[in-house]
């Protein structure tokens, strides 16, 4: 099986796109951008060349890092580098924000990433600042919880969990019973959502670099986590070790772990001869569960969007977009793949910064 991607639209935003959420009817997309939260009316899938312009719904006081739809697409949650969580009511017809129902500072540092449970009733945000905690520059443990689980309806905190900072990614499993997160140092933790108990905790050294050139500190780590469709294994993504962390030339990398085993076992990883160089920042599963996407920045190689078989881990599809990809999402029917990110930051022209945030839409087919 091979997966083919046919580009069916590119939509620009004033600034870089950090995350996206797509309505179940595939008619509207919401974007978390460096300068705010945007809504984009999506043209029909057949209208490949039709232009669409986003509208700003609101702003945080810093970069917006995460966005997700709640309660039948009638509310929108967003998180930011200012450490805040906001929930906005949406107009069912226009998709515009009616009011901000909730706003709270949930972290004293950045919200790196946010995830919403499959039933859309729970929000999890992860945080943490990298401060040297010892002579070997290992991170200083955080003085506050770095993982927070919040009830999306009652807006109350359900769990406050501790993990070595910075915690850079988070994901629920398909049942909503388990929560996983990854950090700079390659630590991975799986929790029970109901109790907050740690079910598995381990470290992989494959994603973290120590700078011996220019940057004498730890860098990179795990940037995306995702459970398999049966919840039995956990995938982690980022890039391989580098001697010069400023070069960004680590191997494009994912690893798969049987997290229920004692001890946890690495059971699979991306194949070296099928990957290039660059930081991988997002994972997304096709609704069928037959394959997943890993995407991010390209430093060297043939693709920055790779599609991999769930069964054998083989590369079965690819795309080279020319932009850094920060978020990937499939439509509910699996026929469309959305890729979001940014492409450089141009110099101002005539007193105005040209757009440098983008969402690309691809039609998905099998051959």
Give the predicted meaning of each segment.
Residues 1-367:
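WD40-repeat beta-propeller superdomains and closely related acidic/aromatic-rich repeat-like regions
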């Amino acid at each position: 099986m091979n997966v083919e991607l046919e580009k069916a639209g590119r939509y620009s935003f004033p600034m870089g796109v950090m995350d996206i959420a797509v309505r179940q009817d595939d008619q509207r997309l919401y974007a978390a951008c460096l300068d705010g939260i945007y809504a984009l009316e999506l043209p029909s899938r057949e209208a490949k060349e039709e232009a669409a312009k986003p509208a700003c719904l609101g702003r945080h006081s810093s970069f917006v890092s995460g966005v997700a739809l709640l309660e039948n697409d009638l509310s929108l949650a967003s998180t930011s580098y200012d450490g805040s969580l906001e929930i906005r009511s949406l107009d069912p017809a226009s998709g515009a924000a009616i009011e901000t129902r909730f706003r709270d500072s949930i972290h004293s540092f950045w919200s790196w990433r946010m995830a919403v449970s499959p039933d859309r009733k729970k929000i999890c945000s992860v945080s943490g600042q990298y401060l040297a905690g010892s002579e070997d520059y290992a991170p200083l443990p955080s003085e506050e919880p770095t993982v927070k689980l919040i009830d999306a309806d009652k807006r109350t905190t359900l769990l406050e969990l501790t993990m070595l900072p910075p915690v850079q990614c988070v994901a629920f499993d398909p049942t909503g019973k388990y929560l996983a997160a990854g950090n700079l140092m390659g630590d991975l933790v799986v929790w029970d959502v109901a109790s907050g108990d740690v079910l598995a905790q381990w470290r992989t050294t494959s994603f973290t670099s120590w700078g011996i050139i220019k940057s004498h500190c730890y860098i990179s780590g795990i940037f995306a986590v995702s459970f398999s469709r049966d919840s039995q294994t956990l995938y982690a993504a980022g890039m391989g070790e580098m001697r010069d962390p400023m070069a960004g030339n680590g191997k494009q990398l994912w690893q798969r772990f049987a997290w229920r085993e004692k001890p946890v076992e690495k059971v699979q990883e991306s194949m070296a001869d099928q990957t290039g160089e660059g930081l991988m920042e997002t994972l997304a599963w096709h609704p069928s569960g037959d394959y997943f996407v890993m995407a991010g920045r390209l430093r060297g190689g043939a693709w920055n969007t790779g599609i991999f078989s769930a069964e054998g881990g083989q590369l079965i599809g690819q795309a080279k977009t020319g932009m850094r990809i920060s978020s990937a999402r499939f439509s509910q029917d699996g026929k469309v793949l959305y890729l979001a990110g940014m492409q450089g930051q141009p110099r101002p022209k005539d007193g105005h910064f040209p757009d440098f945030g983008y969402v690309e839409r691809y039609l998905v087919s099998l051959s």
